[in-house]
């Protein structure tokens, strides 16, 4: 089976994008997704993005996301920016703002004149059961307007904020994000028994009230150069704890994102993310698995 694809990245978080809107794509198995995402024998990517026609009213497109392990996930902020650049560059829309159907609802994506994309990420969710996070039997610690939860991570206690941005996140504040053992602790948090759907593990260093450094060990993908929903979750947790003020510049290994959230005044407010989206190359691949 021969597939046409576009390789893109958002702040280094890289994607294989498939057009299932202009023509029908065959269903992809998890084995095929892993083959496409393989960096040695395939194209190589953190996630696979599929553009489809919407199945709900009020949406212009449908957006599906598959991690490099083959599993389908709810949301990807960096992918969303690449998504709107893809449909714009392909002439699939002439709108500056589009409404896109994702697993958890609808999101709004806006292409700016400077080439950056603003994503309306919706309101963060902190209720443990909705993340989902099993807080039963745990004594949480109040910090500002947030609750920190103790996790046993390799025999050490780590205090985390739990946040859903349509997908689950556990965020902890660290002194030095660069030196922190993310590759050792990330997998332990990702698969911690308290998170029934696994979790994205974020490690945030506060630089100032408007600036942070962030590393994220993503569920099903490992550490990536950037994670859009992870940046949103980290900033939301920081504002809720009284450590940050909007807007916040988030420095990742792959680039810089700007996150804005008026959560200090209204936690139901939508959070927005602005950042780059880049097309790397296009091609065809013979898929023989």
Swiss-Prot record:
Keyword presence, Amino-acid biosynthesis: yes
An example molecular function term from Gene Ontology annotations: diaminopimelate epimerase activity
Chief location: cytoplasm
Superkingdom, natural source: Bacteria
Residues that bind substrate: 13, 47, 67, 77-78, 167, 200, 218-219, 228-229
Residue numbers annotated as active site: 76, 227
Keyword Isomerase found: yes
InterPro entries given in the database record: DAP_epimerase_AS (IPR018510), DAP_epimerase_DapF (IPR001653)
Example of a GO cellular component annotation carried by this entry: cytosol
Annotated EC: 5.1.1.7
BP-aspect Gene Ontology terms: lysine biosynthetic process via diaminopimelate
Site (Could be important to modulate the pK values of the two catalytic cysteine residues): 169, 218
Subcellular location: Cytoplasm
Record text on subunit structure and interactions: Homodimer.
Described purpose of this protein according to its UniProt entry: Catalyzes the stereoinversion of LL-2,6-diaminopimelate (L,L-DAP) to meso-diaminopimelate (meso-DAP), a precursor of L-lysine and an essential component of the bacterial peptidoglycan.
NCBIfam families: DapF (TIGR00652)
Protein name as it appears in the record: Diaminopimelate epimerase
Lineage: Bacteria, Pseudomonadati, Pseudomonadota, Betaproteobacteria, Burkholderiales
């Amino acid at each position: 089976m021969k597939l046409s694809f576009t390789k893109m990245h958002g702040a280094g978080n890289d994607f294989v994008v498939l057009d299932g809107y202009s023509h029908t794509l065959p269903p992809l198995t998890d084995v095929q997704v892993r083959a496409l995402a393989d960096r040695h024998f395939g194209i190589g990517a953190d996630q696979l993005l599929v553009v489809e026609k919407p199945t709900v009213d009020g949406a212009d497109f449908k957006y599906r996301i598959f991690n490099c392990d083959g599993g389908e996930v709810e949301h990807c902020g960096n992918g969303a920016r690449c998504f709107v650049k893809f449909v714009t560059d392909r002439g699939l829309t002439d709108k500056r703002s589009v409404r896109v159907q994702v697993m958890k609802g609808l999101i709004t994506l806006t292409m700016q004149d400077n080439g950056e994309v603003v994503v309306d990420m919706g309101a963060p969710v902190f209720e443990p059961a909705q993340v989902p996070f099993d807080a039963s039997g745990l004594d949480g610690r109040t910090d500002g307007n947030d609750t920190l939860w103790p996790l046993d991570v390799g025999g050490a206690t780590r205090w985390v904020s739990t946040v859903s941005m349509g997908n689950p996140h556990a965020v902890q504040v660290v002194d030095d994000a660069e030196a922190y053992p993310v590759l050792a602790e990330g997998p332990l948090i990702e698969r911690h028994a308290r998170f029934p759907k696994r979790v994205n593990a974020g490690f945030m260093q506060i630089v100032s009230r408007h600036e942070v450094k962030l590393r994220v060990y993503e569920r099903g993908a490992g550490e990536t150069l950037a994670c859009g929903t992870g940046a949103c979750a980290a900033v939301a947790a920081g504002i809720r704890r009284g450590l940050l003020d909007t807007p916040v510049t988030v420095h990742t290994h792959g680039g810089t994102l700007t996150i804005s959230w008026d959560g200090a005044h209204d936690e139901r407010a939508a959070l927005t993310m602005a950042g780059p989206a880049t097309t790397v190359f296009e091609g065809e691949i013979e898929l023989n698995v």
